[in-house]
Design a protein with these regions (language model features):
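A mature extracytoplasmic/lumenal domain signature
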Residues: 41, 58, 64-68, 76-78, ...
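An acidic-aromatic
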Residues: 52-101, 160
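Sec-dependent N-terminal signal peptides
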Residues: 4-13
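A short, Trp-centered hydrophobic/proline-enriched beta-strand micro-motif
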Residues: 27-47
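Flexible, surface-exposed loop/linker segments and immediately adjacent secondary-structure boundaries
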Residues: 85-124
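Extracytoplasmic
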Residues: 32-34, 47, 57, 74-76, ...
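Gly/Pro-enriched, hydrophobic low-complexity segments
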Residues: 110-184
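Boundary at the C-terminal end of the N-terminal hydrophobic targeting segment
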Residues: 17-19
Length: 184
């Protein structure tokens, strides 16, 4: 009987509770001003890689490791995707994209505080945010509380999964990278 009680006590107190993990993720995320990372993005089964810088609120610069020099940039209000492939240049209002939610740290923190969150495979912690017919799934590492990726639909309703790695937090990032590229 004592062995069973000891085992139950050990199990209950040796694993972090979901509430504890959630609180640590919120604390860690609230301290972030900017992020630099490498990424792998999967859209419709096709993988692309690259690197990104995010400055909260609402700025992102991503350069893809792609032969067409694809760049994605938001200055906080507009989003531009530029590629040398057929001289492509697309400009969108940021508020019309799922990135509008992802790049708004205050909004994400508010939502995370009100959501339960889910533990996935004892490794990842998921927050699923729904807003304006958009779903944003944000994944964090359960052990170090770092952001590890997100899943959403792009502006064409394609499922987009982004996995991030080599994460660096609160680095010096020059604001000029968020200047929107010109249409050639």
């Amino acid at each position: 009987m004592k062995k069973n009680l000891l085992l139950i006590f050990f199990i209950l107190f040796s694993t972090k509770s979901q509430a504890s993990v959630k609180n640590e993720i919120i604390k860690s995320f609230s301290e972030i001003e900017n992020l630099n990372f490498e990424f792998t993005q999967t859209i419709n089964g096709k993988d692309e890689t690259g690197n990104c810088s995010i400055v909260f609120p609402k700025k992102i610069y991503c350069k893809y490791n792609f032969r067409f020099n694809k760049v994605l940039v938001s200055n906080g209000s507009s989003l531009v995707i530029r590629s040398d492939k057929n001289n492509q240049y697309y400009r969108y209002s940021l508020k019309d994209t799922a990135l509008n939610l992802l790049l708004d740290k205050k909004y994400i923190l508010k939502k995370m505080r009100n959501l339960k969150g889910s533990l996935i495979d004892e490794k990842f912690f998921l927050f699923s945010i729904e807003e304006n017919n958009q779903t944003l799934n944000i994944f964090f590492d359960k052990d170090n509380y770092n952001l590890i990726g997100w899943q959403t639909e792009d502006i064409y309703q394609n499922l987009t999964i982004t996995y991030i790695y080599d994460l660096k937090v609160n680095q010096n990032i020059e604001d000029k990278i968020f200047k929107l590229p010109k249409n050639n």
